[in-house]
């Protein structure tokens, strides 16, 4: 089934974003684990896997539309050197996604590609949940201070 070139372009742009996010979140999770924030690292790693599922769904859609998924392109990673910087970097990538997808969903509907629009709406819903989580972490960091917030993220050995 031949897909619209504009829809395929949008899907490949989003694929690039997902591939970038996978790597950024995965590296952040490994850094967090190395710093001793194992529970936080597990959450960040799960976010990386969520982005991988998005990439898989987008890849499947591109292939169904007789397009070629571009796995050779990846955006610049924004790697934070502190928890705050990591949250801010991850938040920035999520807002980039929303700014691309919201008008993209409208375009898909205008091109009569409801299935792609629904897929992208699902991704937007997932990203909005992640934005809420990241904003909450930054708010907690502001209220508690970075040291107390960080202390809450350290895993305690079992007793």
Swiss-Prot record:
What is the official name of this protein in its record? Bacterioferritin BfrA
> What's a single GO MF annotation on this record?
heme binding
Which gene underlies this protein?
Answer: bfr
- Judged by the first EC level, this protein's enzyme class is oxidoreductase
- Note accompanying the cofactor annotation: Binds 1 heme b (iron(II)-protoporphyrin IX) group per dimer.
Q: Which cofactor does it need?
A: heme b
Please give an example of a GO cellular component term from this record: plasma membrane
Q: Which family does it belong to?
A: Belongs to the ferritin-like superfamily. Bacterioferritin family.
Q: Mostly located where?
A: cytoplasm
| SUPFAM superfamilies reported in the protein's UniProt record | Ferritin-like
Where is the protein found, in the record's own terms?
A: Cytoplasm
Describe the inactivation phenotype: A single deletion is slightly more sensitive to oxidative stress (cumene hydroperoxide and plumbagin). A double bfrA-bfrB mutant grows 40% less well in the presence of an iron chelator, is more sensitive to oxidative stress, has significantly reduced pathological effects in guinea pigs and a marked reduction in its survival in human macrophages.
Q: What does this protein do?
A: Iron-storage protein, whose ferroxidase center binds Fe(2+), oxidizes it using dioxygen to Fe(3+), and participates in the subsequent Fe(3+) oxide mineral core formation within the central cavity of the BFR protein shell.
EC annotation from Swiss-Prot or TrEMBL: 1.16.3.1
Assembly behavior: Homooligomer of 24 subunits, arranged as 12 dimers, that are packed together to form an approximately spherical molecule with a central cavity, in which large amounts of iron can be deposited.
What residues does Fe cation 1 bind to? 18, 51, 54, 127
Q: Where does heme b bind?
A: 52
């Amino acid at each position: 089934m031949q897909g619209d070139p504009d829809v395929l372009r949008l899907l490949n742009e989003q694929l690039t974003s997902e591939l970038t996010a996978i790597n950024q979140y995965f590296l952040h999770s490994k850094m967090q684990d190395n710093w001793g924030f194992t529970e936080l690292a597990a959450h960040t790693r799960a976010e990386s896997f969520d982005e991988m599922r998005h990439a898989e769904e987008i890849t499947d859609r591109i292939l169904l539309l007789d397009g070629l998924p571009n796995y050779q392109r990846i955006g610049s990673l924004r790697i934070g050197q502190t928890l705050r910087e990591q949250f801010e970097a991850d938040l920035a990538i999520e807002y980039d996604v929303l700014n691309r997808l919201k008008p993209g969903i409208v375009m898909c509907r205008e091109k009569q590609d409801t299935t792609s629009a629904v897929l992208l709406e699902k991704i937007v819903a997932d990203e909005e949940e992640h934005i809420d989580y990241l904003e909450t972490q930054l708010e907690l960091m502001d209220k508690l201070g970075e040291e107390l917030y960080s202390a809450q993220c350290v895993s305690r050995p079992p007793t």
